[in-house]
């Protein structure tokens, strides 16, 4: 039986009630997204609350976390309540399109590990389908609705399959967003990138920063660059 929780250095993430479990994608985004000068952060599709918790650990920002699924929201609330960051994170059950923050709040950073199974066959688990498939949150909808909530100097940070890079940039351009920073993530040395970490900005950047990130140099041996961003979270680093 899979472990119902994942223990990090400063908090524990239970995922027994949530369709999508703790995984490398969420850890990557939570460790990589820039929190510099961030006062307000929005986590879209929070699931267990993992990314919100990681960003709270890395910043002094106030965070709002939203999810359309009631069980995910309950799980996130429980995980956050038991963490040292409970006073800075609020969870709301809502879709992004219907989310209306108080007092016309604008966010310095909006993060999402969005659904990305576009054409694949669906599994019998309805809640897992909701979390994995783009029926409920397409990239055009995600960027359009996030853009409305973004501060003028803010960023949108995402983790996606690498093959979606070109289509994402095209969609972003339609919303007057452009890449400011990205990392191409490979599982092992010399393997093609499997994941894309990308920050989109409403302010054009003359020379976007691009890097390559390898997760493991061999089985169960993390690379130096992944260790550098994840060591404050993983117990065995």
UniProtKB/Swiss-Prot annotation:
This is tRNA1(Val) (adenine(37)-N6)-methyltransferase. Belongs to the methyltransferase superfamily. tRNA (adenine-N(6)-)-methyltransferase family. One of its GO terms (cellular component) is cytoplasm. GO terms for molecular function: nucleic acid binding; tRNA (adenine-N6)-methyltransferase activity. Keywords: Cytoplasm, Methyltransferase, S-adenosyl-L-methionine, Transferase, tRNA processing. It comes from the Bacteria. It is found in: Cytoplasm. Gene3D superfamilies: Vaccinia Virus protein VP39 (3.40.50.150). Pfam families: MTS. The keyword Nucleotide-binding does not apply. GO terms for biological process: methylation; tRNA processing. It is an enzyme of class 2 (transferase). Specifically methylates the adenine in position 37 of tRNA(1)(Val) (anticodon cmo5UAC). It catalyses: adenosine(37) in tRNA1(Val) + S-adenosyl-L-methionine = N(6)-methyladenosine(37) in tRNA1(Val) + S-adenosyl-L-homocysteine + H(+). The keyword tRNA processing applies. PROSITE patterns: N6_MTASE. Its EC number is 2.1.1.223. PANTHER family: TRNA1(VAL) (ADENINE(37)-N6)-METHYLTRANSFERASE. It comes from Parabacteroides distasonis (strain ATCC 8503 / DSM 20701 / CIP 104284 / JCM 5825 / NCTC 11152). Its main location: cytoplasm.
